[in-house]
Swiss-Prot record:
Domain notes: The SOCS box domain mediates the interaction with the Elongin BC complex, an adapter module in different E3 ubiquitin ligase complexes.
GO BP annotation list: insulin receptor signaling pathway; intracellular signal transduction; layer formation in cerebral cortex; negative regulation of signal transduction; proteasome-mediated ubiquitin-dependent protein catabolic process; protein ubiquitination; regulation of neuron migration
Protein's name in the database: Suppressor of cytokine signaling 7
Main location: cytoplasm
Topology within the bilayer: Peripheral membrane protein
SH2 domain segment(s): 400-509
Annotated Basic residues bias: 208-219
Keyword Membrane among record annotations: yes
Induction profile: By IL6/interleukin-6, prolactin and growth hormone.
Biased composition, class Pro residues, residue ranges: 89-99, 154-164, 187-198, 303-313
Quaternary data: Substrate-recognition component of the ECS(SOCS7) complex, composed of SOCS7, CUL5, ELOB, ELOC and RNF7/RBX2. Interacts, via the third proline-rich region, with the second SH3 domain of the adapter protein NCK1. Also interacts with GRB2, INSR, PLCG1, SORBS3/vinexin, and phosphorylated STAT3 and STAT5. Interacts with SEPT6. Interacts with phosphorylated IRS4 and PIK3R1.
Associated pathway: Protein modification; protein ubiquitination
Superkingdom in the source lineage: Eukaryota
Amino acid sequence: MVFRNVGRPPEEEDVEAAPEPGPSELLCPRHRCALDPKALPPGLALERTWGPAAGLEAQLAALGLGQPAGPGVKTVGGGCCPCPCPPQPPPPQPQPPAAAPQAGEDPTETSDALLVLEGLESEAESLETNSCSEEELSSPGRGGGGGGRLLLQPPGPELPPVPFPLQDLVPLGRLSRGEQQQQQQQQPPPPPPPPGPLRPLAGPSRKGSFKIRLSRLFRTKSCNGGSGGGDGTGKRPSGELAASAASLTDMGGSAGRELDAGRKPKLTRTQSAFSPVSFSPLFTGETVSLVDVDISQRGLTSPHPPTPPPPPRRSLSLLDDISGTLPTSVLVAPMGSSLQSFPLPPPPPPHAPDAFPRIAPIRAAESLHSQPPQHLQCPLYRPDSSSFAASLRELEKCGWYWGPMNWEDAEMKLKGKPDGSFLVRDSSDPRYILSLSFRSQGITHHTRMEHYRGTFSLWCHPKFEDRCQSVVEFIKRAIMHSKNGKFLYFLRSRVPGLPPTPVQLLYPVSRFSNVKSLQHLCRFRIRQLVRIDHIPDLPLPKPLISYIRKFYYYDPQEEVYLSLKEAQLISKQKQEVEPST
């Protein structure tokens, strides 16, 4: 069933009054069948042929006949049933009648329904059918939107009838929805049409649902680019058809989806603009673990580049990683040595087998067995000075170490000595352990010795070749380089503009150069065995305790000075005791 708008409403013309002929002379075959059920051809039953949709078409035809006639329009018997169709030859096939409108329906919605129903027939079928004249389009009963000719086509029993009423469709036209509703409210409602003589009977379903036929026609017209409705051909612009098709496809609901489930997704101009089209995606967005999938199995045409494998996990135990690559002697190294300096191959992850080939160092088994195992020469490893305490015990045996001494006493010891004379003493600063006093350019200089990560040097961050595990090794190396004319260290001058002072160590000042007294040797031994804070608790007279608490390096002048001072103190004490008695 198709209602087509065949042209614009022409200008109203004055028609002279004529004698009113009979209804059969004024009505076209379509309207005659709608009013008189006997006009059907013999052997054609409306109930068996057209099904439930015939009632809707008959109602629309009767509503068109029930509208009030406009000026210059012929009427049937002076009533309100216009039929401006001129007498035309009968169609090649007999047209079935249309049923009368049912009671309770609003005839104001007929114009919107007629606008929607204009797309039910294809363009090829519309050229063969007879259309109404232009006078019918000027009738106010059409709502100003143009009328149409009712064509009934025999349906097939494949698909069910229309799942939704015609009144629920979106009204189409040149105006928006709000403007059309306001225009309908302003127009007076026409009188209800009289009931028709025909009643719809149940029959087989039509061929194709209403939504499918509409979408098929609109898809064809929108792709072909139909002309506008103002050119006299009765066709609306393709933009309006596309909008109406989008509205109808959205209102199809689940019934249309179930019918089109077996069809392949077809992309049309209407669907691409208003409705989504489902494609089978190449990438579903699912993440896959790289350990479970080998990237070498991907094809060359894959849009995604191969992803590199994740870095291998290291074992928590460092000894487990290097036990198979390093000799046993390195594992028994002292605590001060750093194991991070040795390159380690990445071990495989313990949780999963190797899914990717890893680069491993090439090892020749024959060369390992043929060559004897070489001992790694670690510069930080010394078996005789593996701890700080051992290095201090080694330092006490050296004569150039003078123990606790301040810088004034050190200058007194180095006074008059040649350049290159030096001694090592305990630092008076509690932040440092040892200090170096040396003679250079006729002046005595003092500098602190740094202890950095188990090594000794004159700088806070010495170079690798300057690091020494013990003080004895450091002094011996400095003496060797000083004799060769190579100076390892230089001191910045306190006077701006002067060059730095080279540290030259050539002549150690030993504390064993002078013969020591028995008193000093006893004090030296006691200081080696007893802590300095426990000296006052020793069972000794107070003069001996005061002597032991003093510096324990040997100085003959100090011995003479102390002996004279002690003699004076003893004489004073005796003089004080005699008057008191």
